[in-house]
Design a protein with these regions (language model features):
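Bacterial N-terminal signal peptides that target proteins for export
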Residues: 2-16, 25
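Periplasmic alpha-helical coiled-coil/stalk elements that build and connect Gram-negative outer-membrane
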Residues: 2-3, 7, 137-251, 262, ...
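Acidic, low-complexity, intrinsically disordered peripheral segments
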Residues: 3-4, 83, 408-472
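C-terminal segment of classical bacterial N-terminal signal peptides
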Residues: 20-28
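Bacterial Sec-pathway N-terminal export signals of envelope proteins
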Residues: 29-76, 109-110, 225-264, 311-312, ...
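Small/polar-residue-enriched beta-strand and adjacent coil segments characteristic
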Residues: 33, 72-137, 257-269, 274-339, ...
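Short, charged, amphipathic alpha-helical segments
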Residues: 121-124, 187-198, 323, 389-397
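Hydrophobic, well-ordered secondary-structure elements that form the walls
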Residues: 308, 325, 332, 354-357, ...
């Protein structure tokens, strides 16, 4: 496995990170950031482990295809007892024969029109397709970590806003009660304030429950409980245009690359099946030694032969298999077209969502500023008797709504940014430069692609790799 050094963040985020470190407390230094979440998910994902094992199983199909082009050598030992009774001039004769035979046989496919070689190429393309599918799974796992992290951050911000809202409403309730005692407001004003406090308390309880649920989801995805959230994650570099994003996706998206390799594998498989209709040539050889256990003579046998065979009629099974493989090839080509369109649509949707989230964040920021000014003014006017309690409560609700919208827009922007990265096929541990040991699919493949025998040194190396993978 190769070690990938983490990439450098943009200068903006480096400066922000430096300020955070300078102003943070010792407890904040232990906060979990988005990279921690993705690293945890990458290291502990059972889904990734499952698909890595499936990839290793697919690697073995290449070894099986290679083995078809090699000679097959068998060794056999046979102990036999033969009884023979036959007529003679004077009656019947009984004969017992006991023998022990040992022999070696060899069979080697010399020619099959290239069918076995095409099967090997199909297996190699299937391996490449499965590797890309594994990368697609990796993207899904990492995006799940992004969603879990951003949701925890969103719920924490929501709890903070509603806690502050409850505090302000309690202050307003006390103010309404004081003004009621001096006759400035009626009991209705106090009841309105009490109702808003009760509603805010219920909303806060709901938000706290949502936060606990978000933390539980985070632990499920990342594999460890979250401590303190470090804050807003750095956003990926902004793409120049929708066309640029689509161009990157068409070159890099693993699901699209997987389909392309699947089409090539289907082409080789169809060609291999067509070759099976032709003749094949095999070399056969054997050597043996027979021991007569009854005291007779021992004997040695050996022989070699070339066998040219051609199936003349098989009930139509070979032709049916060829047509089926051609149909599967057509199906893979259709799936490739569908995948291309799906990738293009996903890029467009993510790009539009990101642009909308950015615009929404700007608008909600302006809304918060205006709502804060309005709330401060109305609250001050209420102390002078120019505004009612209901005016203050409505202004507070508008401020809370604006702040909540800004928090949601910020979360939507982060999710859309990483969703666009995923849609382009770039949400991988290697591209992000995560400080983890990147899983190298070629390590196992290079050990098995030549179908090593059990007694070879490569087979022993392979056993060590299998044990190491089993411990991970």
């Amino acid at each position: 496995m190769r070690k990938i050094s983490p990439v450098k963040f943009p200068k903006t985020f480096v400066c922000a990170g430096a300020m955070m470190v300078a102003l943070s407390t010792p407890q904040a230094a232990k906060a979990d950031n988005l990279s921690d979440a993705m690293i945890g998910a990458y290291k502990t994902s059972g889904l990734l482990e499952q698909n890595r094992a499936l990839l290793r199983a697919t690697d073995e199909s290449v070894a099986v295809a290679v083995a078809r082009l090699r000679p097959i050598v068998d060794f056999a030992v046979t102990a036999s007892h033969r009884y023979n009774r036959g007529p003679t001039t004077f009656g019947f004769s009984d004969t017992d024969t006991n023998t022990l035979e040992a022999g070696v046989s060899l069979e080697w496919l010399l020619y099959d029109g290239g069918a076995s070689r095409l099967s090997q190429l199909a297996a190699q393309e299937t391996v490449l397709s499965t590797r890309q599918s594994l990368l697609d799974i990796e993207q899904q796992v990492l995006f799940s970590a992004v969603q879990a992290y951003v949701n925890v951050l969103l719920q924490q911000d929501t709890v903070r806003l509603r806690s502050n809202n409850l505090r302000l409403l309690r202050e307003e309730l006390r103010a309404a009660q004081d003004r009621f005692e001096v006759g400035e407001v009626t009991r209705t004003d106090v009841a309105l304030a009490e109702s808003r406090v009760a509603g805010a308390r219920a909303n806060l309880t709901q938000s706290q429950g949502d936060l606990l649920e978000a933390k539980a989801t985070y632990q499920q995805v990342v594999g460890s409980p979250i401590n303190v959230v470090a804050g807003q994650p750095p956003l990926p570099q902004r793409v120049a245009s929708l066309q640029a994003a689509e161009s990157v996706a068409m070159r890099n998206h693993p699901s699209l690359l997987a389909r392309q390799h699947a089409v090539k594998a289907a082409e080789h498989t169809a060609a291999s099946t067509a070759k099976n209709l032709g003749p094949s040539l095999r070399l056969r050889a054997d050597a043996g030694h027979s021991i007569n256990l009854d005291g007779g003579r021992d004997s040695d046998t050996s022989g070699v032969s070339l066998v040219l065979s051609q199936r003349l009629y098989g009930g139509g099974s070979l032709a049916a298999a060829r047509r089926a493989d051609v149909a599967r090839l057509d199906a893979e080509k259709g799936a490739l077209i569908s995948t291309q369109r799906s990738v293009s649509q996903a890029v467009a949707a993510a790009y539009v969502s990101l642009e909308a989230a950015r615009a929404s964040l700007v608008s909600s920021g302006e809304q918060v500023r205006a709502a804060q000014v309005a709330f401060d003014g109305i609250r001050e006017e209420a102390t002078l008797g120019a505004r009612t309690t209901l005016d203050v409560l409505q202004a507070e609700q508008e401020l809370l709504n604006a702040q909540t919208a800004r928090v949601q827009a910020r979360a939507n922007q982060a999710l859309a940014a990483y969703q666009l990265l995923q849609a382009q096929g770039l949400l991988t541990a290697e591209h992000l430069g995560l400080a983890v040991e990147i899983y190298d699919p070629t390590l196992y493949y290079n050990l098995v692609k030549d179908a090593p025998a059990n007694v070879s040194q490569r087979s022993k190396d392979l056993d060590r790799v299998m044990k190491a993978l089993g411990r991970n």
